[in-house]
Regions:
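One-carbon transfer enzymes
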Residues: 1-225
Length: 229
């Protein structure tokens, strides 16, 4: 079926590539190119690089507006990073892919916060995109165990694979149920979240796993700062 994917981050790029192998992805909606890295050179979002490699047209508005024209009525949102206006949400079927068992870990960093908390299981939720952050009714949800060896990279990879399986199950006409339980929130990772306290080995291990391989935890070794993945 024809779908648009709204994605920016590496997790979104992974889901985009997997979806493109199964569906007709008519466009990618992503964030504009931005300066990045120490040299502050303008760089394309990871999802855009994937779309260009696959020959998928790319849309990069500064912010999506109600007047945005999309070449499909079904939109899969995954790690996009911008709010979508209600007028636009009402024009089609918008489904969000969230790598946690909602309502646990709503927000920007669900995988990282899950590992930081020492969770032993997580999962993927497909839900309707609504104005409130990650609060829409659920179309599909499935859990998986976290092993002591899993880092964020491994969890994101497993979540991307599961997300596409769940989307295949619910499209083109999902049914929805309300989210159940008390929500918790996964705030974005701040510099303080990267700091290791080596006097707390279990906490330090959770931190290293949560921030590997994409961010890195920070500590000192023989008086010198080090980054650990």
């Amino acid at each position: 079926m024809k779908i648009v994917v709204a994605a920016t981050a590496p997790f979104g790029a992974d889901v985009l590539e997997r979806l493109a192998a199964r569906h007709d992805v008519t466009a990618l909606l992503t964030r504009p190119d931005r300066p990045a890295g120490r040299g502050r050179r303008v760089a394309s979002p990871p999802a855009k690089l994937t779309a260009e490699r696959l020959g998928i047209p790319v849309l990069q508005p500064e912010r999506p507006t109600a007047g945005l024209e999309l070449p499909a009525e079904t939109v899969v949102v995954v790690a996009y990073g911008l709010l979508i206006p209600e007028d636009l949400l009402e024009r089609g079927l918008w489904l969000n892919v969230h790598p946690s068992l909602l309502p646990r870990w709503r927000g920007a960093a669900p995988v990282e916060r899950s590992l930081l908390a020492g969770d032993t299981e997580t999962g993927v939720t497909i839900h309707r995109t609504v104005k409130e952050l990650d609060a829409g009714p659920v179309a599909a949800q499935r859990w998986f165990l976290l092993s002591p060896e899993d880092d964020a990279g491994a969890v994101y990879e497993r979540a991307a694979e599961l997300a596409v399986e769940l989307l295949d199950e619910v499209l083109p006409e999902p049914t929805f149920r309300p989210q159940e339980g008390e929500p918790t929130y996964a705030a974005k990772i701040e510099p303080v979240d990267r700091e290791l306290d080596l006097a707390k080995p279990e906490e330090s291990l959770h931190r290293i796993r949560a921030l590997s391989p994409h961010i890195g935890a920070r500590g000192e070794l023989r008086g010198r700062p080090v980054t650990i993945w």
